[in-house]
Amino acid sequence: MSVVEQYARAHIVSDADIAEDEAIPVVLRYDPDIDPRSVRVGLPGPHEWTFSRALLEQGLRAPAGSGEVRVWPCGRVQAVLEFHSPQGVSVVQFEQKALLRFLRRTYMAAAPVRG
């Protein structure tokens, strides 16, 4: 099975003085050989979260999660991922289509090969 790595742009949701249009690079990663049920989201710096692929999929339809990672749709074209750690909370807004494309690729990578 092959690793899926997709680069996306996202916006940090904050009340700080950050430009509204300023997007950050994010790495979405799926490695079925390590854990076929998990995905990873890497933000700039040493910030990376691993969580259930099912949580990401559920959160694109309705609010999901109750622990360190929460996901919910935001309007018709956005999705929000909220990450909790001892250092605080990071709230990141994505285009839903980027997350859907990533999920589609993860299912294709995990699909059994039929001969």
Summary of predicted features, one role per range:
Residues 1-115:
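Positively charged, low-complexity terminal tracts
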